[in-house]
Amino acid sequence: MVKSSVSRMLAGNGLFYPIIGFASFIAFLYLSFGDLWVNYSKEINLSFVERNGTQFYVDGKAFYVNGWNSYWLMDHAADYSTRPRIRTMLQASAKMGLTVCRTWAFNDGGYNALQISPGKFDEKVFRALDHVIAEARRNGIRLILSLVNNLQAYGGKTQYVKWAWEEGVALSSSNDSFFYDPSIRRYFKNYVKTVLTRRNIYTGIEYRDDPTIFAWELINEPRCMTDPSGDTLQDWIEEMSTFVKSIDRKHLLTVGLEGFYGPRSPKKSIANPEVWAADLGSDFIRNSILSTVDFASVHVYPDHWFHHKNFEEMLKFAAKWMLSHIEDGDRELKKPVLFTEFGLSNDNEDFEPAQRDRFLKMVLDVIYKSAKRNRSGAGSFFWQFLVERMERFNDEYGIVPWENPSTYRLITDQSCRLAKVQGLLSTQAEHLKNFCAPRN
């Protein structure tokens, strides 16, 4: 009744439609630029993560990572209907005591592409990445940002080769020409420079100056199978890591390896899952030992690598796999080792929910023991965490952690254990003090 009377009054004065039009305009501005009005002045102060030998440090204290993967953050931030998921994920993770998220800072040539074509960027998607970084900062979460995919998902090296081929400058249509084609290398360097020097519209900080970013990752799971000697990929890593460091010397850098030992490694026959692993063109030691690479990365997917082992055999292998790489970090690399992806598929024929928790606990236990002994195993990252109503983004490894009480307990227990070793970080204190105290 009141609403209709007001409407008649405004209409009688000829003001109804102008006001409605103005309101629509304001709504449009909010949908387009609404985050510019969000108060980002209350972010938690973060310091850069540094490395000294085999350990990470923050403000002079050892820093061990209980982290996770949510590769989809930028993509979902680009659509206002899904943008709230970023805050939900980051807030929930902070409450679990998680400290670092690994996510994609790339999307090449597809839907919600950050890089539409070589050197051409979508400002809307860049603002989405700005939003992700600003939200992470507000919640005291650091980010590992990966710069390109070896796989075809979200463009990857396949898209770079396609662009060069379409422009008539490609040397080869092989996906692996990404690593050696001069034109494609220029494409990628331009992309890297654009991202590293981007000024966040919400915080006013260039990415290369923002301690919210834990590290850059050159490429997710690099393989160059057309050159199993490893020389092609090694040359690319040397060139690109040097290029990144020429622009940004404040942040740490890793390659993004799965951890397989190459044909020249004495461990190729005793630590690799199977013979094929030595012929992928990568080599954990050789690729990671470069002075421009600050820490090593390893993935742990025994059920993906083996097809004829039972769960107990895979669990035993995974533990041995982790310890082998921690040994490498201590003795060969003299650098920290992060297990940046680990998971167990729920599509395995003999899968039982309890198996996943046993596998996760094994990984977390190895990291905790390494931290207690000041060894190089510096942290781990679950693959992957989702929020509700994201079923189509699940790849058989994903979980909504707060919907799985036993898994949730494992995550928070690890946060408490690492906090006991390193001391509570200032960003964790509010969330962890209450529920860690009874456990300690």
Task: Identify what each model region corresponds to.
Residues 3-10, 37-336, 342-358, 362-367, ...:
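Active-site mouth of glycoside hydrolases
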Residues 2-38:
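N-terminal signal-anchor transmembrane helix specifying type II single-pass membrane topology
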